[in-house]
């Protein structure tokens, strides 16, 4: 991670097992430092001691300014992010983070919120539920997990639902005879002013999009985690022109991203997830047509071709001019 976005030095003060293969990590700043505000659904960028940068959702109540808490699932196919956190990170270690950003914000004025979560996708959803509880708003949760051992925050969720009189449907794959969580039913049954949220794996997101396809886009919100890059691998070479650097040009070779190309050539950029799910590397496009492969930008933004995420998106035109 590099400037101009400032980083904050944090210390790991507590590690808690939340469920099987799922830990929460409490991070606190230097004494006397007040952390930037955040809202439910926000994430922070974390720079790990092994050089890897990742984005993780915040799960603590949004009013807290003395700590950030993230919850991380151990991905057996991890390239070093979750595996490092689970196997090597210890209380007392220091990390640097990028302040919170939110691409999955809660609509606090909604008359009713319908929340869907799959696996570790519960993390931003749990943050939202805590905020909805503070507001006294109505909500319902539909949460799918592999099995009972993998349910994060089960006791807290059950208590929150009981206090709010909210519907809490827990779907366990191991007990469902191969059936997937029903998303279409809750969507159809919800009131016409309800706002819908979903965070989960790709299969769940596709089912969610199908279930909400006829709804106005402002009522449908979602966030991916661990997303695979979309689209076919690019075989074409293209040129990136940096408008703010006297038209400096770089060739992006097949198998490379714009971000990787810039970093290899000493051009520092802010980034975190490298998977197109956090939005940290969003960059303004001045000329050319991006090949959008992220999960953050809205369909309207993608159609405008005015901005792109350079960690994953490529180019449909032979030349891209970026506001860098």
Swiss-Prot record:
Gene symbol of the encoding locus: pcpD
pH effect on activity, per entry: Optimum pH is 7. It maintains more than 70% of its optimal activity even at pH 5.0. PcpD loses its activity quickly in basic solutions, retaining less than 20% of its optimal activity at pH 8.0.
Instruction: State the protein's name.
Output: Tetrachlorobenzoquinone reductase
Pfam families according to UniProt: Fer2, NAD_binding_1
This protein's pathway: Xenobiotic degradation; pentachlorophenol degradation
Enumerate the spans annotated as 2Fe-2S ferredoxin-type domain.
Answer: 238-324
Task: Read off the lineage from the record.
Answer: Bacteria, Pseudomonadati, Pseudomonadota, Alphaproteobacteria, Sphingomonadales
Give the organism the record lists: Sphingobium chlorophenolicum
Q: Where does [2Fe-2S] cluster bind?
A: 273, 278, 281, 311
What's the subunit arrangement here? Homotrimer.
């Amino acid at each position: 991670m590099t400037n101009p976005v400032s980083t904050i030095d944090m210390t790991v003060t507590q590690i808690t097992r939340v469920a099987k293969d799922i830990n929460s990590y409490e991070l606190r700043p230097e004494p006397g430092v007040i952390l930037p505000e955040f809202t439910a659904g926000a994430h922070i960028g974390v720079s790990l001691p092994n050089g890897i940068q990742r984005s993780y959702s915040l799960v603590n109540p949004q009013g807290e300014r003395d700590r950030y808490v993230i919850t991380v699932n151990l991905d057996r196919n991890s390239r070093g992010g979750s595996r490092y956190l689970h196997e090597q990170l210890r209380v007392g270690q220091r990390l640097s983070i990028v302040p919170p950003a939110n691409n999955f914000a809660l609509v606090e004025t909604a008359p009713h919120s319908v929340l869907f979560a799959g696996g570790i996708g519960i993390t931003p959803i749990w943050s939202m539920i805590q905020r909805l509880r503070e507001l006294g708003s109505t909500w319902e949760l539909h949460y799918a997990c592999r099995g009972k051992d993998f349910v994060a925050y089960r006791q807290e969720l059950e208590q929150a639902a009981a206090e709010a009189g909210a519907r809490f449907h827990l779907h366990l794959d191991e007990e469902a005879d191969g059936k997937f969580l029903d998303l279409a039913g809750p969507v159809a049954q919800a009131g016409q002013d309800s706002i819908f949220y979903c965070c989960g794996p790709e299969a769940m997101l596709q089912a969610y999009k199908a279930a909400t396809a006829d709804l106005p886009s402002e009522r449908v919100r979602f966030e991916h985690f661990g997303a695979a890059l979309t689209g076919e691998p690019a075989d074409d070479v293209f040129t990136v022109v940096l408008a703010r650097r006297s038209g400096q040009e770089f060739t992006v070779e097949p198998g490379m991203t714009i971000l990787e190309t810039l970093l290899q050539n000493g051009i520092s950029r802010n980034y975190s997830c490298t998977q197109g799910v956090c939005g940290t590397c969003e960059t303004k496009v001045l000329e050319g047509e991006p090949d959008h492969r992220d999960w953050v930008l809205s369909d309207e933004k993608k159609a405008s071709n005015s901005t792109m995420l350079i960690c994953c998106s490529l180019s449909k035109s032979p030349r891209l001019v970026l506001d860098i």
